[in-house]
UniProtKB/Swiss-Prot annotation:
Keywords, alphabetical: Cytoplasm, Methylation, Protein biosynthesis
Record NCBIfam families: prfB
Chief place of localization: cytoplasm
Recorded family membership: Belongs to the prokaryotic/mitochondrial release factor family.
Modified residues (N5-methylglutamine): 249
Mod. after translation: Methylated by PrmC. Methylation increases the termination efficiency of RF2.
GO cellular component labels: cytoplasm
Pfam families in UniProt: PCRF, RF-1
UniProt-recorded name of the protein: Peptide chain release factor 2
GO molecular-function term, one example from the UniProt record: translation release factor activity, codon specific
HAMAP family: Rel_fac_2 (MF_00094)
Cited function: Peptide chain release factor 2 directs the termination of translation in response to the peptide chain termination codons UGA and UAA.
Amino acid sequence: MEVAEIRQKIVENKEKLTSFRRSLDLDGLEEEIALLENKMTEPDFWNDNIAAQKTSQELNTLKSTFETFHDMLELSDETELYLEMLAEDESIKEELEEALVKLEQILSQYEMTLLLSEPYDHNNAILEIHPGSGGTEAQDWADMLFRMYTRFGNAKGFKVETLDYQAGDEAGIKSVTLSFEGPNAYGFLKSEMGVHRLVRISPFDSAKRRHTSFTSVEVMPELDDTIEVDIRDDDIKMDTFRSGGAGGQNVNKVSTGVRLTHIPTGIVVASTVDRTQYGNRDRAMKMLQAKLYQLEQEKKAEEVNALKGDKKEITWGSQIRSYVFTPYTMVKDHRTNFEVAQVDKVMDGEIDGFIDAYLKWRMGDD
């Protein structure tokens, strides 16, 4: 590495640290740590074990954020010192390069920590795909997205399960529900919520005309035991049915599939992945809790935006991304303007660039 390149990297790293400092509010962070530490010394702190564990985890996260930032500051100062010494002792260059690599790795990890800092970013995720109007073409597009997200999840090391699968009449799917289990699953996948638009020559059109199709994607965090969602038994209607996998695989001879309808809201969820009716009901209840909680959060967001006079529409139906197969190839996110030409790679699950751009855009928007 040339000295000029080293000097440039040191400048860029300092700029990143300055940006992190602005977004962190270190004084506020210290105050919050002190408050939580005082709270943990109270005599009745461990009376509510679940709440105590949550507070303890929150404190550990804040401490880690604070300490890591100061470690990076020290490492940054160290690289500057090495640079000054390099003019008199070239043998120190290797140590300088090692310190730079170490700092850049920590900076990259830290940036992702800041980007995934919203309340449920670390939770598992539930993702639903529903084709819009357009028959077989739209249902095939939904199936393509199903494949894309499955490949993405597997590449990330998530445990991906198909909770419910409704096959299309001729091809594709009518709906599918997936669960993604792993660190930051919801934090990564929340960027995918909205309507996805496809433009291509339809393989189902004998005239080979260009078609535009739409599919909606819903993403919810799977809630843990610290979040309570009150659901009355009287408000739930349960139906059972014979369940089977994609394409009619492993069809059960008994009714193990469970469909729950929340009567007050009309929300419907279903699970077919488990071999028992009890297991599927448990999974369906988790999905229903997540949907009802998400609905409540949307209502609160709408109230806040009404007070602010925010004109932005907060709906599942806002078009977020276009996938163009013809007359050229391009995938473009309409929120961040991030785009790539390699549509095949995107359909193979390579959506990290879109997720990264969304998280940075969202952090700036907040």
